[in-house]
Amino acid sequence: MIMENKRIEKYKEFFTGEFLMGPNSLRLLDEMLEKHPLKEGGRVMDLGCGTGLTSLFLAKEAGVSVFATDLWVPAAENAERFKKWGIEDQVIPIHADANTLPFAEGYFDAIVSIDAYHYFGAKEGVFTDKILPVLKPGGVFIAAMPGVKDELAGEAAALLLEWMEGNKDDLDTFHCRRW
């Protein structure tokens, strides 16, 4: 059975291609929040939020104010979605690149990035120079990204490289724990 967590079960209507842009982002986020609960009422950036499903979950389940930040999904689209979901007073849609975040230094209590960090965070200096400065001292950074059980080789690596249009830098972000 896919759904066994009651907290996630409430959101099963969103488990469609329209909202999910990768693995089950709510399952990943829920597991992370179990280990690292956020302070209710805190200010959180959902970096790489996509269609805002993780922002919805953060607002409803963690009780935080969310800055739903994404480069690929227009903020206006997310604003409409957030209004429809009744969270427009708790979640602010932001259209921004992780390399040029429009926030003051030390602005966030936490930064969450579920299934997105590997798109922008693998480049040297992005985390320390672009992302970390907007996190308050003592703040929490939570990230979950795809991984593989074994190193990619042979046909699997060739297919993934083809899918990534030959960009070896992107392929280099997929490694197993033993790497």
Each language-model region and where it sits:
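A short SAM/SAH-binding and catalytic strip from SAM-dependent methyltransferases
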Residues: 110-123
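Acceptor-substrate binding/catalytic loop of class I
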Residues: 160-178
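A short acidic, Gly/Pro-enriched loop at the edge of an enzyme's catalytic core
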Residues: 99-111
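Conserved SAM-binding loop and adjacent beta-strand
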Residues: 14-30
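Conserved class I S-adenosyl-L-methionine
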Residues: 140-166
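Class I SAM-dependent methyltransferase SAM/SAH-binding core
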Residues: 45-47, 51-100
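A short glycine-rich, Lys/Arg-flanked "PGG" loop and its adjoining helix->strand segment in the class I
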Residues: 125-140
